[in-house]
Amino acid sequence: MKVCSFLPAATNMIYEMGLERYLNGVTFECPSDKPKVVRTRLEGRNLSSAEIETFVTESSNMGKSLYYVDMELLSEIAPDLVFTQDVCDVCQISTSVVQRAIGSLEKQPKMVPLIPRRLRDVYQNALTIAKELGEEKIGLDYLASLHKRVRAITDKLREHQAEPKRVMVMEWLDPIYNCGHWIPDQISLAGGVDMLSNPAGYSVVTPWEKVQQYDPEVLVIAPCGFQVERSIKEIDQLTSKPGWSELTAVKNKAVYLADADYFTTPSTTLVDGIELLAALFHPQLFEIPETCMKKVVPISDTELSWV
């Protein structure tokens, strides 16, 4: 069976389950040496957060997709199965674009759209992938290992009767976006509550005044698609805002930059994200996982690096 994964989350889970032998094509974002079938019009553009927001908005208004398929490569692969998504046309290539692309192929592959809204949907997607590849047992074992890691966190929070922290996870810097979809589930399991979030829904522009009024105890900044190194370059867009130093999170030195993959890629990295958040929300109970050490930075550390 020849498989193409048109979203990094599916690619990640396929690799995590040890099923990469089925993969024949992936996206430009996938950490894989497989042929890159899906590309984006943003490749090679060194744009700021505000410029990306403008580009995305203008493309949407003109009915243009941010992504396209390398049809020559896809025809050469002639996949039997294609995993795609139907959650966010900004984050990944949409099902409608994929449908048009595969419609011109001589051999029509089976298309399996993955539609995660909450964390439980992400788990179900892993099982769907395993079943489609004829490897259900591997999928079940994989899920059991993820659930075990999450239970270790929730059990410890319950044991110590830890009070939920008032937090905010920010998905974009300019303009500021709150978090949505499965991220509020991650926050809850890690011992926090984000009253600015939009569970199971899209993240939306959130006025700075609203953030000030909410006054989070812990602030985690993880712009979609950005790694810490990229976010550091634009963090002054927040730190220069009026009233920044008055936020409780700032006073408590509880503001962090983190890689977006821990929150915006609906795969096993979400469990890594839960473990990371638990350590940021309740440092007296949890330590930052060793695998996350280089992918999360306290704002105070970034400020020192500018001196």
Residue ranges and their predicted role:
Residues M1-V307:
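N-terminal ligand-binding lobe of clamshell/alpha-beta domains
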